[in-house]
A protein has these predicted regions:
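A short SAM/SAH-binding and catalytic strip from SAM-dependent methyltransferases
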Residues: 133-148, 170
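Conserved Class I S-adenosyl-L-methionine
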Residues: 30, 38, 76-78, 201-293
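Conserved alpha-helix/loop element of class I SAM-dependent methyltransferases that forms part
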Residues: 47-67, 82
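N-terminal, positively charged/glycine-rich alpha-helical extensions of SAM-dependent methyltransferases
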Residues: 14-39
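Class I SAM-dependent methyltransferase SAM/SAH-binding core
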Residues: 68-125, 149
Length: 293
């Protein structure tokens, strides 16, 4: 990968900073997202469910010919890399995430051209009003504790005529591996099954609710919402189980009830029952939302 991933970020007032790997990282007071999750997320979940939708979002952003793009909830950089591949060098890309450990993983992988990585809280973006042409968020809105407030922040930093583009997952029934993982965990922990998947990543799919939150965030134009179906493939039934359980906050839910190994094996068994031992192929579905300021 290109060495262009190393560059200077000037810390904002009221933040702490440290120098590491040629980058000045902005730090908030939030607890760092640590441990093995970022690596597992990148190794298993990115190719399993995120790459196809990252390419889709990047195409939608590029079609608008933006000069400056803000990515929120960048994670380990799958959309960042897709944007870097399709946007001209003159287009500035600022990729942010709440968790520095995820951004460190993104920076370690690198991009094909210059990108600015910066820790930022979507609830209070550290950018001036009207400073970006496009704000893009891949599978992050579901995690915002106050969605209208976060969406209002995206509107604030958008220039007039700019666009917010984000995607969210469809329901569990339309995301077959995730549904199998949920069923496997319910069998393993019948008295108190982990509900993270259906509660958060796969719990924000209703179009009317999404449109209402966008409007509550101050957007006057109606939100355009389209459904995009893709396929999810892995070499073995164990790969989706590892990805969903050990590469997401679901890991903590499982650990609170028993061992991660027990949960992962139960999910693997359920995926095997439904799809065979591997290679496995399942349906995934997302909704893509576009709204202009």
């Amino acid at each position: 990968m290109s060495a262009t991933r190393k560059h200077l970020i000037v810390p904002a007032r009221g933040t702490r900073a440290y120098w590491r790997k040629g980058i000045i990282w902005r730090m908030a007071d939030d607890k760092a997202f640590t441990g093995s999750i970022p690596k597992v997320y990148e190794t298993y979940l990115v190719p399993l469910i995120f790459e196809a939708y990252a390419a889709d979002l990047a195409r939608r952003v590029a079609a608008r010919g933006p000069q400056r793009v803000l990515e929120i909830a960048a994670g380990t950089g799958v959309v960042t890399r897709a944007l870097a591949a399709v946007l001209p060098e003159a287009t500035e890309i600022v990729a942010t995430d709440l968790n520095p450990a995820m951004l460190e993983q993104a920076a370690a992988i690198g991009t094909s051209r210059r990108v600015e990585f910066q820790q930022a809280d979507a609830m209070q973006l550290p950018f001036p009003d009207q400073s970006f042409d496009v704000v893009v968020i891949q599978f992050g809105v579901m995690f915002f504790p106050d969605k209208p407030k976060a969406l209002a922040e995206t509107r604030r930093v958008l220039r007039s005529g700019g666009a917010l583009i984000f995607n969210v997952w469809g329901s569990l029934e339309h995301n077959e591996f995730a549904a199998a993982v949920q069923a496997g965990l319910a069998a393993a922990f019948p008295d108190d099954p982990p509900k993270f998947l259906e509660r958060t990543p796969y719990g924000y799919f209703d179009h009317a609710r999404i449109a209402a939150d966008v409007a509550a965030g101050g957007f006057v134009a109606p939100a355009e919402i389209v459904t995009v179906d893709e396929r999810s493939r892995a070499q073995s039934a164990g790969d989706p189980a590892i990805g969903y359980i050990q590469g997401s906050p679901l890991k903590g839910d499982v650990e609170a009830r028993g061992s991660v190994e027990t949960g992962t094996q139960a999910a693997t068994d359920e995926i095997t029952r439904r799809f065979g031992p591997g290679p496995v192929d399942g349906r995934i579905q997302a909704h893509v939302v576009t709204v202009e300021k």
